[in-house]
């Protein structure tokens, strides 16, 4: 959009919801723009939060104004808040190599530890050759980059779609920033696989492994890390190469990347296509997954929750018919919130909360959650603190000029009390 909200601060009463049922739990967020500069096009937000009031948002920022659909010259920006107040905003990417005019930095993700340190990953092509690698940056609470590197050890082929998750209490507990990164690895003549790397310190890569099988196609990974440092990885899995995808799942150990939960399927309904998973884990290692599925004949978003030992609490639960690109967060009581995008007159963004029984009783009711009702809103992403505080971010084009910016909603709870 051509940013009418360059200095946006919207009161909670401006949000949009569907008509609630009796006793519904309706969110009342505090809204703001995550990006401080509204020139050009901001897309692909990701969000993280922690137990101490920090919220971090990253996005692609293309300040060209010639074509909103062209992501050439996109940079990666990070902005961090604490208790609703912005602490800093910083550009983490560095444009292109000398003489290169078609560079790109895309698909960012962010994680936070409990001290407020952020880890950001993205796919970068600074030399404009169409091949990507996965850089990372560690950023402290003052917005200073304290460590950097490349998550992938080999630059051969194509590395895309990275995600990151941060050990909440460091390694060892109370120690250095520790994190895990996953990405999709595509090598010439071989099927796409999912790679994972674990860091026990800001620059200490402890391991790199192939999380998926090496047969069939594997895409769109996500990762979540508990206080143990173990990483739960999910992805689109077609290990038997029959062109039907399920949600692959494995947990990898902090010290060496060995499986601490064997490779398996997260979804219980196996018909149709199961794709685009999102995963979240809490301090104790319980985790939950959301994904797209069309096994009923109609596409929608679904979810399932697991104990730290990998035992499912319930079979697949439908979040929303027609829901696309779900994002999930979890608190320390293993209650979850799922956000998604749905086709309406344009596109709208929604959220819904769940308890450990797979219902939304006492949790956020299914509701449209937009700051401004008009135009197109999409790419909803959700983060939940250990105390059930929720933060969301999404892209907004309420004036319909095709240029987006990033809206941030904070200060609401998944609990109804």
Regions found by a protein language model. Give the residues of each.
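Secretory targeting and sorting signals
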Residues: 1-24
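Extracellular, repeat-based ectodomains that mediate carbohydrate processing or recognition
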Residues: 24-417
């Amino acid at each position: 959009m051509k940013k009418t909200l360059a200095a946006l601060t919207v009161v909670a009463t401006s949000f949009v919801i569907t008509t609630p049922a009796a006793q519904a739990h309706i969110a009342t967020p505090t809204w703001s723009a995550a990006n401080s500069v509204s020139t050009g096009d901001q897309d692909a937000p990701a969000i993280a939060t922690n137990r101490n009031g920090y919220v971090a948002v990253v996005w692609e920022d293309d300040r060209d104004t010639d074509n909103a659909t062209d992501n050439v010259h996109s940079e990666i920006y990070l902005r961090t808040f604490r208790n609703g107040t912005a602490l800093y905003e910083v550009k983490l990417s560095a444009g292109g190599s000398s003489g290169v005019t078609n560079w790109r930095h895309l698909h960012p993700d962010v994680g936070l530890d409990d001290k407020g340190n952020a880890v950001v990953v993205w796919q970068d092509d600074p030399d404009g050759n169409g091949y990507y690698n996965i850089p990372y940056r560690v950023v402290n609470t003052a917005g200073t980059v304290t460590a950097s590197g490349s998550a992938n050890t080999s630059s051969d082929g194509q590395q895309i779609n990275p995600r990151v998750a941060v050990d909440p209490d460091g390694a060892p507990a109370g120690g250095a920033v520790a994190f895990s990164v996953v990405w999709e690895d595509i090598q010439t003549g071989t099927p796409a696989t999912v790679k994972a790397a674990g860091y026990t310190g800001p620059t200490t890569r402890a391991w790199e492994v192939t999380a998926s099988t090496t047969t069939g196609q594997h895409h769109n990974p996500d990762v979540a890390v508990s206080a143990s440092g173990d990483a739960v990885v999910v992805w689109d899995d077609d290990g038997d190469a029959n062109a039907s995808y399920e949600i692959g799942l494995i947990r990898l150990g902090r010290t060496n990347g060995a499986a601490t939960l064997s490779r398996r399927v997260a979804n219980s309904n196996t018909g149709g296509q199961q794709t685009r998973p999102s995963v979240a884990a809490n301090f104790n290692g319980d985790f939950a997954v959301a994904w797209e599925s069309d096994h009923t004949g109609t596409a929608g978003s679904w979810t399932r929750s697991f104990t730290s030992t990998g035992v499912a609490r319930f079979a697949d639960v439908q979040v929303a018919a027609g829901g696309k690109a779900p994002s999930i967060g979890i608190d320390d009581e293993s209650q979850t919130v799922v956000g998604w995008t749905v086709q309406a007159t344009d596109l709208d963004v929604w959220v819904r909360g769940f308890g450990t029984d797979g219902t939304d009783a006492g949790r956020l009711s299914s509701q449209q959650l937009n700051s401004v009702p008009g135009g197109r809103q999409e790419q909803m992403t959700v983060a939940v603190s250990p105390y059930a505080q929720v933060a969301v971010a999404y892209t907004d084009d309420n004036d319909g000029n095709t240029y987006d910016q990033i809206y941030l909603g904070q200060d609401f709870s998944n609990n109804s009390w």
